[in-house]
């Protein structure tokens, strides 16, 4: 249909299906690398299979190695105890890590120029770990991040099997990810393992070791020179990002309790949906266009939106807080046959197709019975389209 059929900001369609990388070695920059965590009790070797430069990242030190050597009179061999522990269990994995912590804690702050802040905001704008942060939390994260220039290729930023102390966001350049099935870097050729992905600007890595207090699950190496990373330390990561995730889940659960469609679900079922939702904000006039492939289901958290059909200038349905749309296109595996335009700035909770099919099975029959007043009349007048929002 013509792009001029509906009101709103035509041509802008953030609700459309997300792009998917054709090459598995070059994933979308919005994806975070996820690798299965390995056995914590593996000993961390210090060998690698190619000459990699030193990166002053996790537990870096400028102290000469000789300063750590013990004399013969100590009764210990040289370098005794120099290996890094990889099985650490002292840190709490409470889903709300700040619940019992010192309330006087304040996040670190590193002054940045306006130009640095703009670059950093752009780098994290598409990262899902930061999507649910409020303005105060976002400001804390921006203040705590530290710029880490990576001047040349083949600098090893993190090593599989090591204990992790930092989370990294890529601003510039690319980084290759290697995984060794043994669970850690091994000596000799091929010791890094297999290359499984490349992280590009906007991507991030290192969160798994901090979230689960486990060894690094992969080795990440700069794939080119003149790269730029931003690092966030373990404590700040856990206190801000993990605590905000916990709070976000609680907010979602409260919101889902108010959604009539989900009233028949158990608390456990709603909690699983809450974990899968992603919050997005859009300005007034943003459009989900008729004819798009349906890949997402939306719950309206705040704001107002309207549905339009081809050939009709008047809205056929209005949406407000607690309403939902996008379900029929997923239920019927059909293109969207109506356009939804945000009347005001809106905040929506998005659920992908896989999560929709897996988690909303118990209410499928209710969604199929949903009647869209006014849509049926439009369909009778324009029989070429079905009422699948």
Swiss-Prot record:
Phosphoprotein recorded as keyword: yes
GO MF term list: cAMP binding; cAMP-dependent protein kinase inhibitor activity; protein kinase A catalytic subunit binding
Region (Dimerization and phosphorylation): 1-128
Keywords from the named record: cAMP, cAMP-binding, Nucleotide-binding, Phosphoprotein, Repeat
SMART domains noted in UniProt: cNMP (SM00100)
Binding site residues for 3',5'-cyclic AMP 2: 261-377
Ranges annotated as biased composition (Polar residues): 21-31, 87-105
Gene3D superfamilies (alphabetical): Jelly Rolls
Keyword Membrane attributed: no
InterPro entries listed in its UniProt record: cAMP-dep_PK_reg_su-like, cAMP_dep_PK_reg_su, cNMP-bd_CS, cNMP-bd_dom, cNMP-bd_dom_sf, RmlC-like_jellyroll
Name of this chain's protein: cAMP-dependent protein kinase regulatory subunit
Organism: Blumeria graminis
């Amino acid at each position: 249909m013509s792009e001029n059929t509906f009101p709103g900001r035509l041509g802008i369609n953030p609700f459309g299906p997300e792009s998917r990388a054709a090459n598995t070695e070059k994933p979308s920059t919005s994806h975070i690398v996820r690798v299965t965590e390995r056995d914590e009790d593996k000993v961390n070797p210090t060998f690698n299979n190619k000459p990699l430069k030193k990166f002053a990242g996790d537990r870096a030190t400028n102290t000469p190695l000789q300063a750590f050597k013990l004399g013969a009179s100590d009764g210990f061999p040289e370098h005794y105890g120099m290996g890094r522990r990889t099985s650490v269990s002292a840190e709490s994995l409470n889903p709300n890590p700040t619940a019992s912590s010192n309330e006087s804690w304040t996040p670190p702050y590193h002054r940045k120029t306006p130009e640095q802040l703009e670059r950093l905001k752009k780098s994290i704008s598409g990262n899902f770990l930061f999507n649910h942060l409020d303005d105060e939390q976002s400001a804390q994260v921006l203040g705590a991040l530290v710029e880490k220039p990576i001047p040349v290729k083949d600098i090893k930023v993190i090593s599989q099997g090591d204990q992790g102390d930092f989370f990294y966001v890529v601003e510039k350049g690319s980084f290759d990810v290697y995984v060794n099935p043994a669970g850690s870097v091994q000596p000799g050729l091929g010791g890094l393992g297999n290359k499984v992905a490349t992280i590009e600007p906007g991507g991030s890595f290192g969160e798994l070791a901090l979230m689960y207090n486990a060894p690094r699950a992969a080795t990440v190496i700069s794939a080119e020179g003149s790269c730029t990373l931003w690092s966030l330390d373990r404590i700040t990561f856990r206190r801000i990002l993990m605590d905000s995730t916990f709070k976000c889940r609680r907010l979602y659960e409260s919101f889902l309790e108010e959604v009539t469609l989900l009233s028949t679900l158990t608390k456990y079922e709603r909690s699983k949906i809450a974990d899968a939702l992603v919050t997005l904000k859009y300005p007034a006039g943003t459009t989900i266009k008729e004819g798009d492939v349906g890949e997402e289901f939306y719950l309206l958290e705040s704001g107002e939106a309207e549905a339009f059909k081809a050939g009709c200038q008047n809205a056929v349905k209005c949406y407000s807080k607690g309403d939902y749309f996008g379900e029929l296109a997923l239920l019927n595996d059909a293109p969207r046959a109506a356009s939804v335009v945000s009347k005001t700035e809106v905040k929506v909770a998005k659920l992908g197709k896989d999560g929709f099919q897996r988690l909303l099975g118990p209410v499928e029959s209710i969604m199929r019975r949903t009647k869209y007043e006014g849509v049926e009349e439009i369909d009778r007048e324009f029989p070429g389209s079905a009422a699948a929002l």
